Amino acid sequence: MTKGENSIGVDDYFQDRGPTVTFSNLLYCVQETKFCRKIGPEKIILHDVSGIIRPGMNAIMGATGSGKTSLLDVLAGRKNPAGLRQGNVLVNGKVVTSDLRLSSAYVVQDDILMGTLSVRENLLFSANLRLNPKDHSTADKHQQVNTIIEDLGLTDCANTKIGTEFLRGVSGGERKRCSIGMELITSPSLLFLDEPTTGLDSNTANCIIGLLHKLSRRGKTVIFSIHQPRYSIFKQFDHLTLMHKGEVVYAGAADHALMYFTDLGYQIEPFNNPADFFMDITNGETKSTPHLLQTKLNCKNPLAIKYQQSQLYQNMMEELDHVNQSIVDGVTGEDKPANYTTSFFYQMRVVCGRTVLNTLRNPQTSYAQLALNIFFAILVGLIYYQMPLTLPEALQNSLFFKFHENSSGYYRTSVYFLSKIFADLIPNRMIPIIVFSAIAYYMMGLKPAFETFLCFALTMSLVSLAGVGLAFLVSASVSTFAMANILIALPFVFMMVFGGFLVNLNAMLSWLSWVKWISIFKYGLDALYINELKGLFLYSNNTTISGEYFLEQQGIDYSVWGFWRNVVALLGIIFVCMCLAYVQLRRINRWK
């Protein structure tokens, strides 16, 4: 984006009245890729799109794939600017930067709420992260939350949990209102919503639009995409932008749209919903005059051509030309990173607190996992209870190893990443593994020395964290659960084959022997072998074999450094996986 003397900061975006958003000649393209390789030509998502959006209810309507959500994202600054080939977006006639994402509000289509927290707790989480602690005391934040709850009609369910697949919670309409409330905490004058009525019944959808209409009458600029609203919803629109195949086919007053298309020769059936009528027109499912039928044969998108030839379009472009004259030609600047209202450590405290609370309230991720580890620890302990030191049984130690597994300017990517590690991944992996080790270790009759138990628990924890790090890297690199499940299974199977579980690594083909050095299981198994067998004697057919001899036959260095080398290797794998996962999160966080 361009920036110069006309660019503005966060505090200058909005006045008492909502801002006017203008956009001129937007051309947005995406490049289709497959396995990180570009395939085919660029696909045009938005083609020469222009418009003026003023305070009030502004609907962007169109069929699936028409480009309405893409236009909304471009206006909100949520699309990768690399795809914007031409055009600009202005707020009150001035160039905007990434700070717009912090001073406006954007409600996504799917409600992103913590299901184990109540409506009030979710709103308070938003207030804690988006209201500056220097300007707003704790009492001020609670007062703001209470005001939002009252304004959105959430008083009756304020202390009810949102709900998960295992926990019954609030209704769909209440979830949507809570999502809107999360964004209204900062009292923004510019509000974006992506299909706010999707998935709601007609009555609930009407209530949501009524809420937005009330907000718009307070001077806010409300911009939202919508598919095909009922008439009671449509009549609340002030401005309508109708999209078809990435182009605008009408932009103007919503109550003038019917007259515009009637003048083009389209005939609406009696008692038909105007919104349905407009969708039928764009889909080619309505009657038109012979003149329009001929026009359809001569161009790909006749509706867009007709709109660009209309006086309505010419008047709008004249106004846009006047607005664009204020932009300084030839001045460019970089889109600086957005400034957050709260510090890094304050964000860490709030996000970690929510993560811990979610873990404690979600039995599937805490108590059930701990109980499962205790169950398997007792089971393994009973199977190998007080195992004798005869050679066949001693070599079956490999049978009982256990391994386990998100922008609207709320907080930094690094805060999410570190809170995920310190408040979620480490407690959920290390505590169950330590409990597992404490039960199984002594039941199996392994070395009674406490330091060997600590080495056992340390190794098990590191192997688990290394597996989690690899899973975290894969999940941060792909966008679907199905693909993540496939990609995470392959390396684990690969590492098990070359980790010493299934074959003797010394008997492996020489040109494949290098593969063992990237196996998590190889380092974990070697460390456990050294920890248990060093200084131990195994008996078989009146023959005594030292543990050191067995380790030598396996090609395992049983020196002090030999053990800690495996620990360092596991720490290295954890560090590399976590760093790469963080890089992936940084890469995809802003625009996906």
Model-derived segments and spans:
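Conserved ABC transporter NBD signature motif
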Residues: 51, 77, 84-100, 163-165
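Short, conserved post-Walker A segment of ABC-type ATPase nucleotide-binding domains
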Residues: 58, 69-82
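Conserved catalytic motifs of ABC-family nucleotide-binding domains
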Residues: 98-99, 111-121, 135
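Helix N-cap at the start of a conserved alpha-helix in ABC-type nucleotide-binding domains
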Residues: 202-203
